[in-house]
Amino acid sequence: MPVISMKQLLEAGVHFGHQTRRWNPKMKKYIFTERNGIYIIDLQKTVKKVDEAFNFMREVASDNGTILFVGTKKQAQESVRDEAIRSGQYFVNHRWLGGTLTNFETIQKRIQHLKKIEKMEADGTFEVLPKKEVVLLKKEQEKLERFLGGIKDMKGLPDALFIVDPRKERIAVAEARKLHIPIIGIVDTNCDPDEIDYVIPANDDAIRAVKLLTAKMADAIIEVNQGEELTEAEVAPVEEKAAEETTEA
């Protein structure tokens, strides 16, 4: 049974593509028809592709891999942040800083600087510094948190990227491809699907559509993690019983 239904996709407006004059011919195989100058995405193919992406997400999570959610357009910012946090992963939902992946060491230095400022605020250093200096530090903290807050606890390069609108996030796509990091992407009719390993043909402009698909990818990770928790919960009583029996013997 598919992980997402046609009804859910229709209700969220996933089938609405871009205007016919704004399209990438490589997306032709994912287009069902054209209506009033707008391409309509073939949702049967979307259902299948969501399944493939979902299963890949599960694989990554099963190997304790990390996934970086990326979506800096307004329609994606909230979903990307919320679903990454819900699934215990990482996110970039404002500007993608060039070198986030390809120059990870430098980015890590900026993150360390952010953590240093946070520590200064927490341990009371701000209270003994001149007001002007504190204002500047807070401004810097705010800026760094905005761009790097979603990855400040990411210890190394991610094992996969989930991207909303690869056309907008072309720098992130280029960096991931250079480092051979697999990409799952919500790909609209104006995007190049060849750059994405797991294409989800869908409307990337409607908030509901983005939310539905991003949440579904997060669900894949959560399912795996909850499964592990259940297994541990089931194993614990068995181990306790075995220990008791050994003691009695």
Swiss-Prot record:
- Name the InterPro entries on file: Ribosomal_uS2, Ribosomal_uS2_bac/mit/plastid, Ribosomal_uS2_CS, Ribosomal_uS2_flav_dom_sf
Q: Which domain of life is it from?
A: Bacteria
Which Pfam families does the record match to this protein? Answer: Ribosomal_S2 (PF00318)
Gene Ontology terms describing biological process: translation
Q: Which CDD domains match?
A: RPS2
* UniProt xrefs under SUPFAM superfamilies: Ribosomal protein S2
Keywords per UniProt: Ribonucleoprotein, Ribosomal protein
Where does the secretion signal sit in this chain? none
Task: State any GO CC term.
Answer: cytosolic small ribosomal subunit
Spell out the molecular function terms from Gene Ontology. Answer: structural constituent of ribosome
The record ties this protein, via PROSITE patterns, to: RIBOSOMAL_S2_1 (PS00962), RIBOSOMAL_S2_2 (PS00963)
Entry's family note:
Belongs to the universal ribosomal protein uS2 family.
What's the protein called, per UniProt? Small ribosomal subunit protein uS2
User: Which organism is the protein's source?
Assistant: Listeria innocua serovar 6a (strain ATCC BAA-680 / CLIP 11262)
Gene name of this polypeptide: rpsB
